Structures are given as structure tokens and as C-alpha cells.
């Protein structure tokens, strides 16, 4: 059926049993890897939940916004139960290996980026949007989801990494000269480029780049802060989460506690910047 052939009457004729049938198909008969010689069937609960969420949003729009439907057949449908799993993160030893592995023409830039991920737990999108003016003596200004501003403190080792990188950055003229991190073509660094440099560093450190990513470095920062005794609500503020988990309500933490959180993160003590002192490789 083509979308252009679907009219409002077709949608009105769909009832809850049809949605149940679709969800059953997803759980049991939908091919996960259809191009494989031996495809597996049944997509994950998380994938089914995302599809049901889209359907719920569609019917809510038709019933509450456009008033084209009087009844919502999916209003009372429950989401699939999701398997709870602990997020993957690097150990202290793996984090040290990752930082020690950084090399190449962009060594100082890449080292500073990894230090910011491990110390501040920021998102990739937040990192690529950092400007020179967002860097303060002991913290960075971050614009997170929903265009919300927060300040995240970092430790002395992270400060040294940024200071080692800034002279190289200041020699470059970027198309967006506000950008803290630039690329080899003199543009603001992209999310894709950050993904590649993290993957490269993971491989050089002998770590599985299919299991770890920039987002896993965010998990690492959060885990290490918690293991260092930081209150979960403080970590929530550092990460810029409205909810640290599904039941946690966002709580504002005073800046002094955020600074303590930065120093309590064991990763803030890792410092391998001396290995770059004799390396004058230039950014590209």
C-alpha cells in the first residue's frame, strides 16, 4: 500500500487488535538482518518500543490536535518491557591506555577532546559546538539538549590538555573562527570526525571499538564520578540530564558541588600531557 492511497477512513478502520498483530509481527516475524543467508527474526524490545511510540504520537495528533478521530486505539497499549543492562564504560586502566595511545598530527587536539569527554562527560554534539569563548579557567560552558546552558567543571589535568592545544588552535583560521576544535579542512570539527578520532584512539589502545564509543566515554565519566563518591543528583547536573533515570527528577546543584564533582572524578588525575611536550605536530 502506498501512503498516497491511505485516507482517513483507512486509519479509522484500524483497531487495537490490528496494532497487537503488528507488534506481534515485530516481535516474532520481522527479519533483523534480511540480507543475511541465515536471517534472525524478532526485533528488540527497545526497537518495538520506539515504533509503538511513533504510532502513539500519530494517533494522539489525530485525536487531540486535528480531531479527525474520536477514539485512540493505542492509548492504553503498554510498551514492551525493556531489558535493563548496565552501560558499558572504561576502567581506569583502559582510560589511561586510551589517553596514552593518542598520537599523530592532531595529537594535542585529540588528547584535549578525550580529556573533555572523560572529565566532563559531555555529549559529542556538545563538544563540537564548543567555542573558544566557552572555555573558562576551571570550567566550560555547554549548550545541551533543549538549548539549555550549564557549566561543567574540569580538573587540572584537563586544563593542561586544553592549554597544550590552544596555541595550535590559535594559529589556525577556521571558517567558523569561534570554534574550539577545528578539522583538517579548517571547518568546525564534525560529530563524524569526533567519532572517527575516538575509534582510532580506541584501536590504538587495543580496545574494542565496536563496544566503546564517544558516548561510552560519557558513561565512563559518570561511573567514575559515582565511584568517587559523588552524589547521583550532582552527576545528573554534570551530565545535563533532566532525569538521570526514569524516576529521578532534575535537581539543581550549587556550583561549588559541581567543582567538587570534577575533582572527585578519578579520571581528572590522569595526566600524560608530558609525552607531548617534545611533539610539535601541527593540526590539519
Language model feature labels by segment:
Residues 1-284:
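Conserved catalytic core of the tyrosine transesterase superfamily
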